[in-house]
Amino acid sequence: MILAIARKEFLDAWRDGRFRIAAAVVLVLLGVALLLAWQQVQRTRAEHNAAAALERENWLNQGEKNSHSAGHYGVYVFKPLARLAVFDRGLEPFVGTTVFLEAHRQNQAAFLPAQDATAMRRFGELTAATGLQLLVPLLIVLLTFGALAGERERGTLRQVLSLGVRPRDLVLGKALGLGAALAVLLLPAAGCGALALAQLPGGDVGGGWARLAWMGAAYALYLAAILAVCLAVSAIASTARAALAILLVCWAANAVLAPRLASDFAQRILPTPKLVDFETAMNKAVQEGLDGHNPRNDRLQAFAQATLKKHGKTRIEELPFNFNGLVMLESERMANEVFDHHFGKLWDHLEAQDRTVTWTGLIAPLLGLRSASMALAGTDFTHHRHFSVAAEQHRRDFVRVLNEDMMNTPAADGHHGGVAGRALWEKLPAFRYDPPPPAHALRAATPGLLVLFLWAAGAWTALLLVAPRLKPN
């Protein structure tokens, strides 16, 4: 009986001209969004590759200079764009894509893509992800609002139940048929999208296919929950018009109201520190120590005395190496401890904000889906943090090599560490970023996936509880 009802609902859905038109519009929008994003990712990658090549040439051709001065000359490194950013751009437009690496400082990523955008960005950006998150649920609303309430109004519900059809079988049959209609619409589109992503060369986030599979599961849970909620509302609403009104209000609350309220809530309970306060505290810690009572000069003087004692010397000039280079190494080590503490604390705070927003998804499933989708696409904050840590490690490695060269080079011609040239610059490799494995993304996506699972389980449980109470009047 359930399969017979499902077959009828499936055929009725596809015979409905309104559904076909709405489905065509959604598919066109998804296709256009995917195509535009594909072109943008290609263009951005080309720009980054060209800029990286030019930056490498500038580094190699900077001329002869003191090796520590080369550390202040610095290099720019560029964040590679994940392949799945074609589908879900996540935070990419709002976090920096370029980091300047230099001695003594850990800089944050700069040059946000959103800074170059028009004022229209405030209304959101159409991507394939936002299409599935917002437009497909609206399509489900239009498909299901009259599934049960409409039959009640027309009097056909009484006739069906009088034939001995159990209310639960009727509800499950309709759910199966309407779900199949959506699957026939979305699965081929998803397959075409996956093939398009496969054609995008290079720059992949690790384990792209595993990430894509988990992303598919996340969206399936989300749409399954939406379908169950819509059918439950249609089952209890007195009229189809009432069901449509209720579902449109729920859609607007989920799509528009909940993200803003969740963001404001997270900001209220976990306020983001001001940039000027963060930098002031970090600079103070560099000069006075993390405890605020250990001045940098005192620490360096103690280090100098310990070095002399270690080598059995009484004067700096008697040391068998250039002490200025060793001081630079120690100065970097002390500063790095401060950077690790302050940036680690800041990043932990921002991740706590994200988790707060994700768990508020218990009242709006879109929040859980966005969190899981961005994490699996490699465009969330945890992936940005991973890149920032990799860039900082590259900075420390290249500054260490420069300072070691300075330490091993006698001072000459007024330079603290002699003069270095292209031979040294070529020893420093260009920055190469290795993205994290799928396990990293799955850990970041777990809270969102759990929220979606709870929503799907709760929605279908509610639908099964409502079904036996289905009445003709």
Where are the regions that the model predicts?
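Helix-loop-helix units of permease transmembrane domains in multi-pass membrane transporters
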Residues: 4-15, 142-184, 467, 471-472
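Hydrophobic alpha-helical transmembrane segments of polytopic membrane proteins
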Residues: 214-237, 459-460
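Transmembrane alpha-helical segments and their membrane-interface loop/helix boundaries
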Residues: 1-126, 241-473
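Long, hydrophobic alpha-helical segments
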Residues: 76, 82-92, 124-150, 154, ...
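Hydrophobic/aromatic residues in alpha-helical transmembrane segments
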Residues: 140-144, 192, 225, 229, ...
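Membrane-interfacial helix-loop-helix connectors in multipass membrane proteins
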Residues: 191-217
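Selective transmembrane-helix segments that form parts of the transport pathway or gating/packing helices
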Residues: 22, 127, 135-136, 143, ...
